[in-house]
Swiss-Prot record:
Enzyme class per UniProt: transferase
Broad class of where this protein is predominantly found: cytoplasm
Gene expressing this chain: rsmG
Protein name: Ribosomal RNA small subunit methyltransferase G
Binding site for S-adenosyl-L-methionine: 78, 83, 129-130, 148
Amino acid sequence: MTPQDFYRTLEEDGFSLSSKQKEQFDTYFKLLVEWNTKINLTAITEENEVYLKHFYDSIAPILQGFLANEPIKLLDIGAGAGFPSLPMKILFPNLEVTIIDSLNKRISFLTLLAQELGLENVHFFHGRAEDFGQDKAFRGQFDAVTARAVARMQVLSELTIPFLKIRGKLIALKAQAADQELEEAKNALCLLFGKVIKNHSYQLPNGDSRFITIVEKKKETPNKYPRKAGLPNKKPL
């Protein structure tokens, strides 16, 4: 998917990018490739592949109608090189984006990236989701949490749901069908008062299958969740 293919596909979906937005995606790509020689950000560095498998894939929840251009508070867990939240932010500037990542070098990259792209209302924090999930400044503060290929739903639910407001939504982007994952996550979702409201499949323009699972938070998360760092992965609920 060339940049021109990317712009044209978005226009067909009703999103006509400004010259500024096109420049932001171009700068994003260049900085990603440059920094990838210093720290491991991605295995995908070829331009057409980045536009398809990072940029287009990241904004899929918007294209599929799961997010609007509103000043909601969105948290991205384990965003790595900023996916999916920063491409979303470029497309929908009204989003207020917070990223938590466990690697400080990635936070350094993201901070520079946001400055170079001129993004406002973006915040970056270094640390573990389990620790921030017990911090009152973060717990129960977000309208939406995104996670792209971070962990199986059984683990992901404990890492993300505590951050949501009641009726807030987890938007999980997956490369594989989530049916089996959701079956395994039934107990975790029950304990965390999360309800699956959508399990959506779609295709990238090249025909690759992708999946978006939407989980809504129904009640306050019990205080003991999330457990200490490492436990959700070691002993899933």
